[in-house]
Design a protein with these regions (language model features):
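A short alpha-helical cap/connector motif
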Residues: 1-135, 142-163, 167-216
Length: 216
């Protein structure tokens, strides 16, 4: 077996350069996020935008729920991939970043596909229990990840996808010296999903790591 390559920043940039191009508004969101200092870390990687776009196209996904929206890069990437009659519901509790995200959605003419709900996602998930989704993307507060994952089964279609970001947690999941609550929480989630007979799953090393689960 050949040696697996380590994804450095140079390799990540190379991947982005040779993948399909982002839209002007996606680039504008990235430029805006670059002005935010440490908060920029909440942005998904460009390679993850490409992955979300392609998985939606390949799987003929129509209805998506996003848990954690920030300034809208992942949501816009999802919306651009959806068919004209597709729908994305984006959950986030931050009113200020939601306003910014909505402004970008309008600029990209995708606002008709996207409904934003501004409140804690735990509450929103209970209120959405009568809806069904083809895909759920989880990228919010890490300490609630397991609850978001479990609640997703109430509203995901059979054969649907649950995709979870940050599951490699800057590589700290494999560092035995890291025992902070966030690292422990991500480790526990990964172990939980690995034993979950309701799904088949893989961790993909894009960005900070994504778990892709197909619901059986």
């Amino acid at each position: 077996m050949g040696k697996n390559i380590e994804i450095s920043e140079k390799i990540e940039k190379y991947i982005n350069n040779f993948s399909f191009k982002l839209s002007p508004v996606q680039k504008e969101i990235i430029d805006y996020n670059n002005t935010l200092g440490n908060e920029k870390r909440m942005q998904v990687a460009i390679s993850q935008c490409h992955f979300l776009h392609l998985i939606i196209k390949i799987s003929n996904i129509k209805n998506v729920l996003e848990i954690g929206t920030f300034t809208g890069l992942s949501a816009l990437s999802i919306a651009l991939a959806l068919p004209e009659d597709g729908k994305l519901i984006a959950l986030d509790k931050d009113k200020e970043t939601n306003k910014i995200a909505v402004s970008f959605f309008k600029k990209a003419y995708q606002d008709k596909k996207i409904q934003t709900i501004v409140k804690p996602a735990i509450n929103s998930l209970d209120e959405l229990k009568n809806q069904k989704f083809d895909m759920i993307f989880i990228d919010a507060d890490k300490l609630n990840y397991k609850e978001y994952y479990e609640k997703s089964f109430q509203i995901i279609n059979k054969g649907g996808l649950i995709i979870i970001d940050n599951v490699l947690w800057h590589g700290e999941v494999v560092d035995e010296d890291k025992m902070d609550k966030y690292t422990l929480n991500i480790r526990e989630l990964n172990e939980h999903i690995s034993r979950d007979e309701r799904v088949e799953q893989i961790i993909i090393p894009l960005g900070d790591g994504m778990t892709v689960c197909r619901v059986l």
